[in-house]
Amino acid sequence: MAIFRQLSLGAKAALAAGTVFVSMIVSRSYLAESLEFRAWRCLFRLQLALFVNSLMLLGSIYIWRSTVSNLRHSPAAESACFQLWKMVVAAFLALAHSSFFTMIFLVAEEPYLFSLVAYTCLGAYVIMLCFLCVLSGMEQAYQLLAWRAGRAVGSLDKTRKLALRPALAVMVTTVLSVVGLLNAAQPPAVTTVEVPVHRLPPSMNSLKIVLLSDIHLGPTVGRTKMDMFVRMVNTLEPDVTVIVGDLCDSEASVLRTAVAPLGQLRSRLGTYFVTGNHEYYTSDVSNWFALLMSLNVQPLHNENVRISATGAHREDDDWICLAGVDDIEANILHYTGHGMDLEKALEGCSPDHPTILLAHQPLAAKRALQARPDINLILSGHTHAGQIFPLNVAAYLLNPFFAGLYQVAETTFVYVSPGTAYYGIPMRLGSRAEITQLILQAAP
């Protein structure tokens, strides 16, 4: 205990994160079978929220020191304005930390105001933390260059420099947050992409597939947005509509009314769905499958359907194979009965007919092409095109395909949707939500 008290606050936060992470492993490995399923599911989601908050605490310490602690020796430190400023920063950080708990306790048909405010603060937290780190790095680089050149570092006194940093951070964070909020509030753009498909039957030339992904029904996305997406899709008059995962962030029973507009989708040859990683975080996939099927949305659980120009499941010569795999996160989580199984998903698909694969993560698309390079087209999501800066950089570096259309080989393409809505944070910076209209064109 004495050793723990001697640790810095940052070290304590890191230790807490490690402890919660170990408890998550124990919960997944040893408690999943002994606890009642609903109790275990709540426990695991609470552990996940605690783990994320433990990591966030490191950033919160840095923000607090940069915007409050470093100013305690300034002439204004005893003023009423500074005391008010401390309360504002504390409330801002508390709201940002509360955001992940709203995913457990505050999810309904429409978002609660508190959830929207909390996730907005989380977005501002990410922007501010990044800006402060970049600003600090620039200061250190300038000081190093000045020292190596044998020059004085600058004329500003230390107090003024310490006050300038939080002022700049607040201004930049406010401007970027407003821009991000306004951008995310816009309806998704409708993007039309023509994809050449080898061996596409003439009767299926110009087949229209509408792609949705990463809607993330939950604390900040509700029925109103879902209804808007459905109306936009219906105006496109799709032949096929596909939803490539991360539809939800809570249990089916909680979001039943929010997802109900999906039942109004009008797709001539059917609507299909594959799981994303967030479906497995809800630990409620079987109930989601049942709910979606009641809405005429067919889950492709490592399986495929044959689609012809006149209807699905036909045995004639003019058809394409539409296959879907479970998200690879199911393999990592050891989710019973689930996991990416490409061989099973493509069973019955013919090399003489085009194959289109639905796989939520671009990493799954890469693995699928390594195993089966004869797949014509893979449709993915997951990246959100980064959603907000600086997460764009991380999403680009961590995924083999980032956003848009990629030609992997002469007859093989991958399309990654930037997402139809957003995850949690109701902002988009450097990205735009999208509904994708893919037009299949016959290729030699």
From Swiss-Prot:
TM region positions: 7-27, 43-63, 87-107, 114-134, 162-182
Cell location: Membrane
Entries under InterPro entries matching the protein: Calcineurin-like_PHP_ApaH, Metallo-depent_PP-like, Metallophosphoesterase_sf
Cofactor stoichiometry and binding remark: Binds 2 divalent metal cations.
EC primary class: hydrolase
Cofactors, names only: a divalent metal cation
Main location: membrane
Assigned EC number: 3.1.-.-
GO CC annotations, alphabetized: membrane
Recorded coiled-coil stretches: none
List of residues binding a divalent metal cation 2: D246, N277, H382
Topology versus the membrane: Multi-pass membrane protein
Protein known as: Transmembrane protein with metallophosphoesterase domain
Organism the protein comes from: Bos taurus
Upper classification of the organism: Eukaryota, Metazoa, Chordata, Craniata, Vertebrata
